[in-house]
Amino acid sequence: DVMQLQLALSRAGYAVGGIDGIFGPKTLNALRRFQAANGLAIDGIAGMNTWTALNKYLLGYFNHRIERGDTYYKLAKRYGTDVKKIVSANPDKNPDNLIIGDTVVIPFGFDVVPTNVMFTSLLTETVIKGLKARYPFILLEMIGSSTMGTPLYALRMGNGTKKVLYNASHHANEWITTP
């Protein structure tokens, strides 16, 4: 999907001239620059290797292996995020005692949920995976399938008395059949 490509490229720092779903010269140029910077074949085609490299920008995080001298503060500065996001994504790690070789989740500085693209079932799943990595306390369950055969998910967070349900049935015009 061109909009998702444009979203990933813009989040990676490559100007696409707006997210409009049109694979024009600005998107092509941004794609080629991304490919060159990431050691990929500079063919202007968003093939499997390019999507693999771009995927972290759709997920909103990546994994980092702890090296000597790493601190959450240094990692936040290096990757343009903040310490609070790293702490939230890694509740099982002691920030004062990082172990060399351990892997930590590094959330990017941008919001996971985009508001400037049309959602698809695949983007919904990607966003959910990104939210789950950033906020590991979220409980995720599949509660069925839509009339179009795509999974329906429920996300649970918190344990208060008030319960609120948000759903993604609006994607692909499925709101028509949502009770």
Language-model segments: which ranges?
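Short acidic, glycine/serine/threonine-rich helix-capping segments at coil-helix boundaries
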Residues: D1-V2, S10-L54, R65-G69, V87-I100
